[in-house]
Amino acid sequence: MPIQANSLKTPDDFPQVQPYDEYNQNLMENVHPFDWDNPEPEGRYNMVVVGAGTAGLVTAAGTAGLGGKVALIERELMGGDCLNVGCVPSKALIRAARAVAHVKEAGQFGVRVPDGVSIDFPAIMERMRRLRAGISKHDSVRRFQGLGIDVFQGSAEFTAADTVEIDGKTLKFARACIATGTRPLELPIPGLAEAGYLTNETVFSLTELPRRLGVIGAGPIGCELAQSFARFGSDVILIESMHGILPNEDRRAAGIVENIMEQDGVKLRCCGKNLEVRKQNDGIHLVVDSHGTNYDE
């Protein structure tokens, strides 16, 4: 009997697509259909691609478009980080946060909003899930099957220089492309694991707006999340070990962003050292030394 790659998978195995509402159900039907049967390998593949994120999908589609015989292997979600826990959901939140900022700035144009801004965070997140599900068809298993690609769902194991095994099936190939990407790093910060934390893989599953949010790391993703949640109304602390936010960018440009984020209410703690997380009766505290000042927040 052929082994189904997803025979042991359930929605609970994917915390990045919770809650399992109609939109996330539609997403999963596209990027990880639970009823999918892996095809029988046919002959020798010109290219086996391991990982169906942005790089893997482009490689697979490009090779197939040139007439190559392609196998595409993905053990989690087609579309990878960009579709599921990166570019798409973050930009949906950024757009909602920008709308908040526009309403708050409306007075300078003579537009009065007497009742101020009211944030419906569950509706913001539902919109994100709806948009993500709509886009997911472009990265779907069945779309790439329609391109003539053999799509396998499961974990790949290289057993020889020209052989990969997946759920009892043997695939022979001339070339292989490993495009498996990365996972969030669990930082060795005292108290972090005990207190619990979010990553880019789980933050987009929130259904309630956090009253307080600490963001560790002020690169592009950290800044996006910090500013968005601050505009939604969370009390946000952004911690960066380097001398300023966006440490890999031009300092003048980063300084402009820094000023705007402070205007949005983000508390910046740069040159952060001796970071510690403490779970106390009144909630989770972040203790950090920033520019020689000790903060307990």
State each model region's role.
Residues 44-72, 214, 222-232:
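N-terminal Rossmann-like FAD-binding beta1-loop-alpha1 element of flavoenzymes
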Residues 50, 130-131, 216, 248:
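Residue-level marker of alpha-helix boundaries and capping positions
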Residues 53-58, 81-82, 88, 183, ...:
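Gly/Ser/Thr-rich beta-alpha loop segments that engage phosphate groups in nucleotides
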Residues 121-122, 237-242, 269-271:
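Short beta-strands and strand-loop turn motifs
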Residues 297:
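Conserved NAD(P)+-binding/catalytic subdomain of aldehyde/semialdehyde dehydrogenases
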